[in-house]
């Protein structure tokens, strides 16, 4: 009996993988994203892990990618601004549909993205060259004009990123396959669908959760792990920007949510 059960479970794995792949492709199609591009985005976080990891063999390449004021940090800043822009544009369309709660949540999300963008570049301190007030410098790990490097704030934000990444990864599964969600009022289903990222963006958020978990509980002081963190943050902000853009675009097209 046990052997038969094990064999059945083994046979069910390829079937589950196949079903998941089909669902990712189908889900991407609802956002007018081709299967090819959906799978490119799906694998980019993993490919980036390999690229950033390999860059450690070259000090120049590593610095170019992960040092302050270099490629990944400025790319993060740009993605955060894009996320804020499309979140606000999407909220305007949501208000036009009288989806007030979803619109307000997108406005809050957009404001949050602007605040994070400012924090990422220390509100322009290294661009304009102003000094850090002594009171802030004394409690800031990098002696910069930002709050996210203040020890207590930093720990809180790291936990928020970890659980936020996990929630963003799980929410699409919950909204698509939970019987409780399917039985909920249409307004609730619509709201959760609005807030749910595309399935192919899942690895962007899962990488963030995995990295933050390792940093918080395993590699607490590793300099290599700290520098590597620029890539999971890039993936997270890319996921946010893509989510906001796809929602904005979907709201401007024939809406599958309101058709169902």
What is each PLM-predicted segment?
Residues 27-44, 192-196:
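N-terminal membrane topogenic signal
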Residues 38, 195-260:
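Alpha-helical transmembrane segments of multi-pass integral membrane proteins
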Residues 53-63, 178-179, 210-223:
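Juxtamembrane "helix-exit" motif on the non-cytosolic side of transmembrane helices
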Residues 1-30, 253-260:
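Short, intrinsically disordered terminal tails adjacent to the first/last structured region
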Residues 143-167, 233-236:
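Hydrophobic alpha-helical transmembrane segments
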Residues 95-114, 183-201:
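Interfacial segments of alpha-helical transmembrane regions
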Residues 35-52, 200-206:
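Alpha-helical transmembrane segments
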Residues 114-134:
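Transmembrane alpha-helix/helix-exit interface in multi-pass inner-membrane proteins
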């Amino acid at each position: 009996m046990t052997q038969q059960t094990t064999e059945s479970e083994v046979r069910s794995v390829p079937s589950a993988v196949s079903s998941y792949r089909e669902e990712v492709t189908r889900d991407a199609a609802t956002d007018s994203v081709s299967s090819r591009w959906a799978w490119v985005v799906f694998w980019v976080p993993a490919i980036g892990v390999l690229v950033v990891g390999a860059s450690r063999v070259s000090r120049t390449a590593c610095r170019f990618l992960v040092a302050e004021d270099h490629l990944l940090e400025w790319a993060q800043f740009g993605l955060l601004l894009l996320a804020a822009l499309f979140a606000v544009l999407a909220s305007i369309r949501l208000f036009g549909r009288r989806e007030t709660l979803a619109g307000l949540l997108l406005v809050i999300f957009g404001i949050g993205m602007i605040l994070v963008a400012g924090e990422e570049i220390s509100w322009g301190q290294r661009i304009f060259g102003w000094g850090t007030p002594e009171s802030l410098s004394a409690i800031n790990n990098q002696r910069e004009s930002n709050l996210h490097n203040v020890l207590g704030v930093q720990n809180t934000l790291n936990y928020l990123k970890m659980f936020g990444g996990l929630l963003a990864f799980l929410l699409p599964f919950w909204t698509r396959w939970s019987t409780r969600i399917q039985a909920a009022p249409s307004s609730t289903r619509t709201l959760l669908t609005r807030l749910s990222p595309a399935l192919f963006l899942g690895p962007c958020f899962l990488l963030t959760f995995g990295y933050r978990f390792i940093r918080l509980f395993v590699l607490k002081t590793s300099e290599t792990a700290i520098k590597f963190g620029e890539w999971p943050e890039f993936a997270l902000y890319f996921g946010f920007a893509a989510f906001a853009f796809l929602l904005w675009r979907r709201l401007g097209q024939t809406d599958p949510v309101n058709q169902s």
